[in-house]
């Protein structure tokens, strides 16, 4: 019998991780409900019921959950991958934005098919991820500072480029809007992601495409890279101790850069699949897109586990879709606050992991003393 099998169930890292995430979600939901009671006591039960039931109320709503979960999953994978290698990729939003721009550039300006546009999104995100990696590896500049700066640089650069590329905007394709990109169903239907084999199951919902399949494949691929390859071992070794990794002959500078490049590519794919769905257009923004930041609680809730990221992103997407059904009993601002509270508390998985571990260790110590 292996050591893993001899280990008590509640002391296994995987079990503790799952329990920590579930406990965090429960605490977040409870505090969210308390907040609803404080704001509008009479509608609190109905509001929470709407939040928890809407996602399964119809196949169209479930399709929307999957649609929103796909880019969220990619951003969660991006942040989690960097976490695993000892880096904090707070620049996922900028990489997401550049991925969206590169993919739309290929779709609208160059009239390329969806799979090329998707690859372009990965390239755009990777390019925007390489800068924080280089500054960290060769100048020891904190990647958080660099990444935040590049979030804003990326947003304003995309705005500048789009404003000077009339053919990219909706106004260049017969629409009156000049503050957003052209609709793909008009500019290049071939760049829209295929509906996939399950579209009929969802009643041909406009939200359904192959993006959720693509993201699950990437989650599995990232897990394999981190857990089953020498390259993944080297990346994690650099994350645990850069000096020890160098002593062992691992090129830590190269791995830091590669980690941020891969992390950026994952965020870039997230931006690509969101806009290549064909259901929305990129609007010239005045503030940083929130999707990249939403990847942080996804990664924390999943404890940076790529497989856990699948379920964490689905949960957060489900809560967001359900929150929209709480109107008119609650204002949109109130709903955003409640969702933020739930997501923030759900991200306390690491804290809950420590609490569970201490509780189990204390119980084991008492049993040993009794014997």
Q: What are these regions, as identified by a protein language model?
A:
Residues 2-74:
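Membrane-interfacial amphipathic/re-entrant helices at transmembrane-helix boundaries
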Residues 54, 59, 151-226, 367-370:
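Transmembrane helix-bundle core of multi-pass membrane transporters
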Residues 7-19, 83-91, 110, 119-188, ...:
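Short loop segments and helix-boundary regions at transmembrane helix junctions
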Residues 1-25, 240, 247, 251-254, ...:
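Cytosolic-side transmembrane-helix boundaries in multi-pass membrane proteins
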Residues 36-40, 53-109, 122, 126-141, ...:
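Single transmembrane alpha-helix segments in multi-pass membrane proteins
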Residues 127, 188, 194, 202-281, ...:
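Helix-loop-helix "hairpin" substructures at the membrane interface of multi-pass membrane proteins
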């Amino acid at each position: 019998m292996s050591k893993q099998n001899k280990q008590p169930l509640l002391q296994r890292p995987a079990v503790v991780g799952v329990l920590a995430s579930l406990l965090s979600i429960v605490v977040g939901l409870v505090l969210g409900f308390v907040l609803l009671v404080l704001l509008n006591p009479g509608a609190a039960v109905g509001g929470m019921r709407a939040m928890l039931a809407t996602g399964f109320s119809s196949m169209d709503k479930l399709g929307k959950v999957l649609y929103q979960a796909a880019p969220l999953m990619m951003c969660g994978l991006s942040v989690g991958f960097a976490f695993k290698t000892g880096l904090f990729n707070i620049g996922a939003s900028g990489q997401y934005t550049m991925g969206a721009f590169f993919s739309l550039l290929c779709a609208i300006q160059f009239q390329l098919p969806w799979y090329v546009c998707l690859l372009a999104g990965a390239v755009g995100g990777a390019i925007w991820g390489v800068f924080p990696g280089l500054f960290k590896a060769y100048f020891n500049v904190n990647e958080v500072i660099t990444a935040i700066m590049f979030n804003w640089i990326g947003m304003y650069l995309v705005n500048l480029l789009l404003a000077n590329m009339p053919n990219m905007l909706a106004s260049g394709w017969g629409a009156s809007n000049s503050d957003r990109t052209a609709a793909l169903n008009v500019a290049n239907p071939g760049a829209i992601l295929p509906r996939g084999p399950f579209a009929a199951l969802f009643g041909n919902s406009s939200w359904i495409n192959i993006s959720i399949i693509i993201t699950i494949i990437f989650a599995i691929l990232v897990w394999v890279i981190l857990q089953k390859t020498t390259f993944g071992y080297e990346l994690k070794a650099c994350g645990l101790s850069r000096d020890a990794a160098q002593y062992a002959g691992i090129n830590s500078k190269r791995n830091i850069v590669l980690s941020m490049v891969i992390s950026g590519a994952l965020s870039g794919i997230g931006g690509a699949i969101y806009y290549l769905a064909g259901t929305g257009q990129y609007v010239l923004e005045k503030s940083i897109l929130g999707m990249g930041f939403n990847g942080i609680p996804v990664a924390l809730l999943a404890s940076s586990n790529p497989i856990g990221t699948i379920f964490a992103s689905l949960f957060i997407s489900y809560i967001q879709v359900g929150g929209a059904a709480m109107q008119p009993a609650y204002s949109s601002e109130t709903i955003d606050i409640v969702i933020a509270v739930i997501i923030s508390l759900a991200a306390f998985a690491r804290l809950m992991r420590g609490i569970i571990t201490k509780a189990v260790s204390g119980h084991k110590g008492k049993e040993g003393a009794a014997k």
